[in-house]
Amino acid sequence: TSYNRSTTQNLEKRALTTGIWRVRDRNGIESRLGLEFITEDRKVPDTNYDLGRSHATMLTASWKRQNIETELRPENGYYLDGKIGATLGSLFSSTAMARAAAKAGYFFTPENKKIGTFIVRGQAGYVYAKEGKEVPSSLEFRTGGASSVRGYELDSIGKAGPNGSVLPERALLVGSLEYQFPLTKSLSGAVFHDMGDAAVNFKKMTMKHGTGLGVRWFSPVAPFAFDIAYGHQDKKIRWHISLGTRF
């Protein structure tokens, strides 16, 4: 059970999530089957725009496969992570809905490690709903920020709402290419290009691009990343700091 209260891109939400799951780890694949319940209040502060309360009771299944040689400094390997879920019609839910989301990444380092590491990442998701306004925003998608499309503020890519807010959308697509080149034993430089969008469907998407460079410090505790990126859409330069590897 978890309770989360947050305001991001001028969207305020309070969400309670609980459920029961059966977890199984077999042949390196972690799978989960369960029943989840989400209830959420959403509004845009200082406006009359109140999305009210929505809730969803969903049967969910998720799979995760991770085959990375060294997690503290990934050089070769891949990860796959997917989740699907659906309500039983509108039973204990604001509306009938189904959701699918997945992310994946691939790391490749040539035998001559001085060449560096090439990384490809991707994310995709979609929510089908009978009544779109009744879907909890926690189940929909926004993107932008250090873990998705760099060069943009956190969750700033989505549907434009009132008072400068950014509201979540039903479809998500994100891709990233990165090259890391060694500087010292524990330090690497990086160049990258990210792209992505969140829209009502995939046909309506207009990819937002971000290009930049950064530094990676592979400490004994966790990797530390500092990036500077240019957001092509709004023509601004932003910096990002993150701790840990993006799995």
Residue ranges and their predicted role:
Residues T1-D81, R150-G151, D155-P162, V166, ...:
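Gram-negative/organellar outer-membrane beta-barrel architecture
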Residues E12-R14, A96, A100, M207:
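Short, glycine/acidic-rich beta->alpha junctions
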Residues D41-L183, F192-M195, A199:
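C-terminal outer-membrane beta-barrel translocator/porin domains of Gram-negative envelope proteins
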Residues G122-Y128, G145, T206, F218-F247:
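Predominantly the C-terminal beta-signal and adjacent terminal strand-loop region
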Residues F181, D197-A199, V215-P223:
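Short leucine-rich amphipathic alpha-helical surface patches
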Residues L187-G189:
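Structured catalytic core of nucleotide-sugar glycosyltransferases
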Residues K204-R216:
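A short alpha/beta connector and helix-capping loop motif
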